[in-house]
Each structure stands twice: as structure tokens, then as C-alpha cells.
């Protein structure tokens, strides 16, 4: 993927050949500036895929159309075989944003980047963790660092083998939810590095070694945690097995 005139020069000096070219239509990350499209170095490239990337495709803003028009301008100015502008959210903007190739990313993993795609995509990541220990709290007992949760009455809880080292961040403290056969198991107190405490009231038969599921439907989990759907996926640590 060529992103600059300098890279194009290096490519040609090394013998050239088929390549892809990224054009910056306004996101100001990678890509050749629009005003460099007419450079003779670009005219010498044998370009397969002419690409750009939308900055705000998950929102309904005028800048989407501005970028699409710049992409059309680039397509008209540069010889190429195929073109691509849209990722997952851009696909939902309509065929005018597609070109010959689209680049679904988040949606392949069950993410829903735009409301139009709700109900069309299925969750694919279902993290689970095991209960390491079951405890019986008494009224007045507190849980976890800084004692942010205190039991109001006797309560059965489970210590689960997942924490922020696995990507289950402290933002879930006191508001996250795990499940067993559809039954809610709220997070109690602070999420620790390697463990999280949950309320077992709804599933009193659970014991050490049993597995519970994280509430990880991406749109809902993003709304609850304040994290993006992308962060929720990429945070999942290497300690998870498939």
C-alpha cells in the first residue's frame, strides 16, 4: 500500500509492479494528499486498488458526502483497476460509497456500527470465565479493593477468573453483568487484575469450576461501559482460549 510520493518513488526505484494506493480524502491519517494526485510519479504506478477511508461513517454528517466526492475525483484522476471507500459503517451508507470492493471489519465480529445494521448481524464473541471460589457474605461484609460494595444481607457470591488483565476493565466495576443460562449475575465491587466478584443469587446451584458468560453483545456492552465496540473486541486478552 503506497501512501506518499516518497513511497511511490521507492516502489518504482525497486522495480515497480502492481500496487495499491491510499488517498487521503479528509481523515488525515495515511494516504496521498489530494493535491498530489496529478504528480507524474503517480501516473507511472500500476495501481490495482485505489483506496480511501471515511472519517465519520458511523454518523450522519455532511463530511461523508464531501469525502465521497473527493474519492470520485481521485477515481477520475488516477488510473486504477478497482476502488474502495467503505468499511463496515460505510457499507450502510449505500452503494454510492462502495466501489468494486468494500472492507467490512467490525461487522465481521458482530459489531453494529450503524442503526441500519441492527438485526442484520449476529454476536460472534462470547467470552466465558470460570468460578474460582464461592463465598458466603454476611450483612456488612464488603467486597474488593476500596470496599466499594457492602452486602446488606447474607449473600452468596462467586469469584470469577477474569479481570482487567484480560481486557475486562475497571469500568465494569459495580455495573457489569455476567450470566448463567440467561440468569443475571451482577458484578459486585471493583474489577481486579485477575478476578471479578459476582452475585450468585439468581443461580444458587453454581459452584467452583462452573463457567459463566460475560454480557458481551457489542452495542449494548458499549453503551453500558462507555467503551467503543472496537475497544471491547481488541481488549480481549491473550489468556482467552477458543
State what each model feature region is.
Residues 60-154:
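Anionic-ligand-binding alpha/beta catalytic cores of soluble enzymes and soluble regulatory domains
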Residues 9-12, 72, 128-132, 230-233:
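Predominant activation on well-ordered alpha-helical scaffold segments within soluble catalytic domains
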Residues 21, 50, 87, 105, ...:
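Conserved, mostly hydrophobic/aromatic
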Residues 28, 57, 109-111, 138-139, ...:
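Short, acidic Gly/Pro/Ser/Thr-rich loop/turn segments
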Residues 136-242:
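C-terminal accessory subdomain/extension
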Residues 1-84, 97-98:
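Active-site-proximal beta-alpha core segment in soluble small-molecule metabolic enzymes
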Residues 25, 54, 88, 106-107, ...:
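Active-site metal-binding loops of divalent metal-dependent hydrolases
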Residues 14, 43-44, 77, 93-95, ...:
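Solvent-exposed alpha-helices and their adjacent loops that cap or buttress functional pockets
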Amino acid at each position: 500500500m503506497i501512501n506518499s510520493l516518497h513511497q511511490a518513488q521507492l516502489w518504482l526505484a525497486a522495480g515497480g509492479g502492481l500496487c495499491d494506493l491510499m488517498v487521503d480524502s479528509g481523515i488525515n491519517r495515511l494516504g496521498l494528499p489530494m493535491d498530489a494526485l496529478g504528480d507524474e510519479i503517480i501516473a507511472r504506478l500500476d495501481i490495482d486498488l485505489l483506496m480511501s477511508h471515511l472519517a465519520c461513517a458511523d454518523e450522519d454528517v455532511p463530511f461523508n458526502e464531501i469525502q465521497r466526492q473527493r474519492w470520485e475525483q481521485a477515481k477520475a484522476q488516477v488510473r486504477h483497476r478497482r476502488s474502495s471507500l467503505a468499511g463496515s459503517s460505510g457499507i450502510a451508507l449505500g452503494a454510492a460509497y462502495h466501489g468494486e470492493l468494500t472492507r467490512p471489519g467490525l461487522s465481521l465480529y458482530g459489531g453494529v456500527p450503524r442503526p441500519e445494521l441492527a438485526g442484520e448481524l449476529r454476536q460472534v464473541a462470547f467470552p466465558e470465565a470460570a468460578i474460582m471460589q464461592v463465598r458466603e457474605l454476611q450483612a456488612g461484609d464488603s467486597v474488593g479493593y476500596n470496599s466499594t460494595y457492602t452486602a446488606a444481607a447474607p449473600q452468596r457470591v462467586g469469584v470469577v477468573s477474569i479481570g482487567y488483565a484480560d481486557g475486562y476493565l475497571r469500568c465494569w466495576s459495580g455495573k457489569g453483568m455476567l450470566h448463567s443460562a440467561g440468569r443475571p449475575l451482577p458484578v459486585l465491587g471493583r474489577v481486579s487484575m485477575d478476578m471479578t466478584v459476582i452475585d450468585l443469587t439468581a443461580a444458587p446451584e453454581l459452584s467452583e469450576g462452573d463457567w459463566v458468560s460475560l454480557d458481551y453483545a457489542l452495542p449494548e456492552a458499549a453503551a453500558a461501559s462507555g467503551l467503543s465496540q472496537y475497544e471491547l473486541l481488541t481488549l480481549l486478552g491473550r489468556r482467552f482460549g477458543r
